[in-house]
Amino acid sequence: MSGWMGKIVAIDLGSRERRTVAVSEETRRRFLGGRGLGVRLYNDPCPDPIDPFDPDNALIFMTGPLTGTTMTSGRYQVVSRSPLTGTICDSSSGGTFGAALKGAGVDGLIVRGRAERPVYLAVQDGEVEVRDAAALWGLDTQKTQKAVQAEISSKASVACIGPAGENRVLFAAVMNDKDRAAGRGGMGAVMGGKNLKAVAASGNRAVAIADPAGYKDLTARLDRIVDKNPVTGKSLQVLGTSVLVNIINAHGMFPTENFRRGVFNDAEGTSGEKIAETLLERQSACYKCPIGCGRTTRTRTKRGEGPEYETAWAFGANLGISDLTAIAEANYACNELGLDTITMGGTLGCAMELRETGAWKENFRWGEAGRLLDWVTDTAYRRGVGADLALGSKRLAVKHGRPELAMQVKGMEIPAYDPRGAQGMALSYATSNRGGCHMRAYMIAPEILGHPVFLDRFSTAGKAELVALFQDVSAVVDSAVLCRFLQFAVGISTFAEILRTVTGLDWSEEELMRVGRRIYTLERLFNIRAGFGRADDALPPRFLNEELQTGSSRRRRVGLEPMLDDYYAVRGWDRNGVPRPQTLAELGL
Amino acid sequence: MIDLDRETLVKMIDHTELSAHSGEKKIANLCDEARSFGFYAVCVNGAHTAYAAGRLAGSGVLVCAVAGFPLGAGTSSAKAFEAAEAVRNGASEIDMVINVGALRDKKFDFVRDDIRAVAEASGPALVKVILETGYLTDEEIVGGCKLSVEGGAQFVKTSTGFGAFGAFPEHVRLMRQTVGPAIGVKAAGGIKNFKEAWRLILAGASRLGLSASVGIVEGLSLYKFAPAAWLEEEIPCHICPSRFANLDKQPKAVYAYYKKKCLACPHLEKYNKYYE
C-alpha cells in the first residue's frame, strides 16, 4: 500500500488492550490521512462529544501518506476534542516525529483510557509497548526526550508533554524533536489527563512510493520551485517567519497591547531582521525540508528555538515588550514546560488589560519583561496567578467579569494579525473550526502578500468564497500531510500530482477539493453536536465596534455579518451554519 | 468569467531570469521548469543563451535573449552585435531595449535606425522592443510603438523590470491600440499573480514576461474554485500608473505628467479615501 505503512494501532491505556484498526482504501481516498483521517477516526469511538478529560476521549496521533517521504514532511497531527475550546481540534507539528512513526511501521495511534500511573508508549517494528514513566513525570520536555532516548534509542524521535501537560493547563502543547510543538488547542493537556508522558518512535522502514521515476522528477521540480519562490526560497530561509513583523506593522495591523492598537513603535526591535542580527545562531529545518524556516537562537545565558513570528508578537507587541532576549527566553521556557506561546501571550495580554481596568488586582503591567518568565513558569505549574492564567483568556476574562477583553474565538486566542486590517482574515478567524487560528485560511496571503491573488484587504466582497477555498486546501495539505509553507510555492494541481506519484491513486483537482470540503464539513458537524453554531462564529466586540486610531488600518472595523451570510451560502450551510442535507449528500457524509 | 485554459496560458509565458546575480544553477532550474510546464520560451541574459539553448534542445521551448539590457543606452552597433551573437548561440527571439533618452529627445530617426540595426542583425529571430513605459508619457509610448514597427520589430514590450515600474493594463491597452492585431504586445515587469496576468491579457497582451510563472499557472487552477475573488471589482487606482508615479525613479517631467493625470481623474474623489 504505497504511501501508508498499513497499520493504525488503537490502544486503551487503562486496560492495556490494543488492536489494529482497519481503514479501507475508500476511507483513505475520502479523508487522506493526518487531520482528515484523524477526525474521521475520532468520530468512531467518540460520536457524541464527551469531556476532553474523560478517559474515553480519544487522542489520535496521525501521519499522512506523504509523511516520511522527501516531500518536506516529517509532520504529524494530534487530533482530539480540545479542552480549551470544546471543539474538535487538530494540532500539527514538524520536526521528524511523523517520519519516525512511519519508520516504526505505524501510520497512526488512537489512544483511549487513562493509565493508572504515568506511562509512555514506545513504537518500534510495528509494535506498541506501554512503558512505565513514573521517573519521567515532572521532567521538562527536553529532559523527557533525552531520558526516553536513553531507554529506547538515541535515534528515537519523542513527542512528549512537560509540566504544563501534566497539570492539564488548558493550552498545554505536545513537544517533539526538542522544540517542535503541536501547540494549539491543549492537546498536551489531553495527553496529561491520560497519564501519558510521551510517545517514542524509531525504525527504518521506508515509505513505499508507487511511481519512483515520477516521484524523482517531481521532487527535483519541487525543489526548484521552492528555491525560486521569493517566500520559500528567500524570506523564510534568511529571516524566518518573523520576517512578517515589519510587514504587518507597516499595514497597521500588528496587534499591540491586547489588540488596542495596530502599530507597535518598537516592532523593528522584535523583527526577523533584528533576530538575525542579534540572537540567531543558525537556521534549522524539519525532516527533509529545503526551506529551513526554524531559528536556533542564543541569549547570553540560554539557547533554544525561536522566536517565530507569532511568539515574537505574543510576548512582544501584544504585551508592549520590546526586549528580544526576554521574548526569546519566554519562548524557550514555553518549549521546555510545554505551553502554546500564542495562547500564553494572548492570556497575558488579557491579564494586563484586566489589571489596567481594575477588574483584576494582580500586578500585570504593559512592557514588564522582567516578570515574563515567572508568569510562564507559574502557569505551567498552576501556582499563584498561574492558576488563573492556565485557564486561557476566555475563562480568565469571564472569571473577572470582563469577557469582552479576551481576544479569542471559540475560546482560542487570536494570533498576530488584527482582523480590522484584513476583512478576509476576520472571516477566517470567526469561522475556524478550532477557534482563533490563522492557519485554517491564511488570508494574509491574498490580502497582504498578494498570493495567489491580490485582494483589497478592507473590502468584504468576494472574501467568503476564498476563505472557504483556503480552508479546504488547508484541510487537504494538513491531511496529506505537508508543510503549509508549500502553499506559497505550489497549488492544488501539484498536490494532486504529489499524491498520485506517492500513493498510485489518482485525484483530480476537483476531487481533492471535495476531500478538503468533506473534512471541513465533518469537523463542523462535530462542533454542531458539541453545541456550537452561528453565535460562536463571532469575534470579540472590540473588532466590530472599536476603530483602530493609528496606522494604515485606522478607522477600520470588521463587517462580519454580511460575510458570514455569504460564507454559509458558499458552504451550503443554512443561516444558522448547519450543513444542509443536500450538502452532506454531495460530500457523502 | 475568465475564458482561458492552462495550455493557452503556458504558451503565452516567457519564463524569465534576468538578475545580475543569477548563476548557471538558476538558469538550469529556469530551463527545467520551462520544459516541465511547457512555457513558450525562457528569457535570459546574453551570457546564458548558449547554455539555455543546449539545455532546452528538443524540448520545444524557445530561448529569448536580451540586448542593450536594461538601459538601452548603448550604441546601435553594440546592441546589434549582442543580438547577432545571441542568435548564433541559439536565441530565437531578441528583447531589445529602446533608446529611451533618444525617444524622449524626439530623435525619431535615430530610434528607428537603432531598432532596425538590431532587427537586421537578428536575422530570422523575432525582435521585441522594450519601451520602458515607466519613463514615458502616453504620447511617447505611442511614438515608441510606431517607431518599433517601422524599425522592423514584431513585438513591443512594456518594461525591463528594472525601471520605474512594471506593466500596467493602461499601457498595454495603449500599445495594443497603436500597433494593431498583427504585432505582438508583451507585458513584463512586476507581474506577481494570476489576476495581474489576466488583467494584462484582457488589455491586449499576447505574451507575458514572468518570473512568477509557476505561481501564476497554479493561480489559474485555484481561480476555477473561487472565481468571485478573482473577478472582484477593481479599485482603479490600484492598477493605475499615475498612482505609482515616483519622483525618485522617474524623470521629473514624467512624474509631473502622471501626477497631473491623477489629479484630473474622475476616480480620484471616490477612491482617495483608501489613501487617507
Please report, for each region that a protein language model flagged, where it lies by residue.
Chain B
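N-terminal capping/small domains of soluble enzymes
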Residues: 1-64
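Active-site mouth loops of central-metabolism enzymes
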Residues: 8-24, 64-79, 101-107, 128-141, ...
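Glycine-rich, proline-tolerant flexible connector loops at the mouths of alpha/beta enzymes
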Residues: 31-51, 67-74, 94-112, 158-167
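Short, well-ordered coil/turn segments that N-cap beta-strands
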Residues: 38-40, 59-63, 90-92, 123-127, ...
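Catalytic cores of alpha/beta
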Residues: 53, 74-85, 136-147, 170, ...
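Glycine-rich phosphate-binding active-site loops on the catalytic face of alpha/beta enzymes
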Residues: 65-70, 88-103, 150-165, 187-229
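Conserved anion-binding
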Residues: 83, 93-154
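Flavin-dependent oxidoreductase catalytic cores
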Residues: 214, 218-276
